[in-house]
């Protein structure tokens, strides 16, 4: 296999892939220097997905936008909620009865700040996440909010039985030293000069909302540092 050499390498492969690359690189011969904090302080942003069935009528989720917007549930503090439709799903070759049913459902989500007590490890060449929903009380609040939404609207709300996230964060966190973090304030990996992380793996805490802006701000900060002379 060929080799490429560079003074600086920026990892922005997404939280899961960045962790996988770091674990694999640290275990290969002549690879990365050890990272004691790798895999610690991992989170899922308390994402919980569900669906809300609306009453029959002219309205269809196929003619909605992917994101309709955020909303609050009275009496529930902490989580953020939002909903959206399924535009374009009706163009797929699905049975007519299934399309009629899906047209009545809205995509529903709740999310918030989880504790970061979860972790990730690399076992048998596979990245494994250790996440216990029971350690995150916010999930109970989100499920309770879904129940309130159903009782107040009179329309069924269904939540997935297990958390399902697209907002993983951490595992290669910003920290003050190698024992408490994987990257320093510049985004450079401790013990591995010239290696930088600019994605959600470096976040030291949950954002509690879609984290794209926070990740973009972090990447911009690291890029600014790389652009400086010296």
Enumerate the language-model features and the residues they cover.
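FAD cofactor-binding and catalytic pocket of flavoenzymes
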Residues: 6, 35-142, 190, 197-204
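Flexible loop/turn segments at secondary-structure boundaries
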Residues: 17-19, 59, 116-119, 165-168, ...
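A conserved FAD-binding loop/helix module that cradles the flavin
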Residues: 204-226
């Amino acid at each position: 296999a060929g080799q490429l050499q560079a003074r600086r390498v920026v990892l922005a492969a997404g939280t899961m892939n960045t962790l996988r690359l770091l674990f694999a690189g640290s275990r290969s011969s002549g690879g990365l220097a050890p990272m004691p904090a790798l895999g610690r302080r991992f989170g899922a942003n308390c994402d919980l997905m569900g669906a809300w069935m609306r009453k029959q009528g002219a309205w269809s989720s196929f003619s909605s936008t992917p994101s309709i917007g955020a909303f609050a549930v009275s009496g529930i503090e902490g989580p953020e909620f939002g909903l959206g439709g399924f535009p374009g799903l009706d163009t797929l070759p699905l049975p007519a009865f299934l399309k009629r049913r899906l047209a009545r459902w809205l995509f529903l989500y709740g999310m918030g700040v989880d504790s970061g007590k979860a972790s990730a490890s690399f076992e048998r060449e596979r990245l494994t996440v250790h996440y216990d929903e029971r350690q995150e009380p916010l999930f109970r609040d989100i499920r309770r909010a879904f129940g309130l939404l159903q009782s107040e609207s009179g329309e069924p709300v269904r939540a997935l039985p297990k958390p399902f996230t697209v907002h993983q964060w951490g595992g290669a966190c910003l920290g003050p030293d190698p024992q408490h973090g994987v990257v320093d304030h510049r985004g450079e990996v401790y013990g591995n000069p010239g290696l930088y992380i600019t994605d959600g793996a470096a976040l030291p805490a949950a954002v509690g909302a879609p984290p794209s802006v926070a990740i973009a701000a972090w990447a911009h900060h690291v890029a600014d540092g790389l652009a400086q002379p010296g």
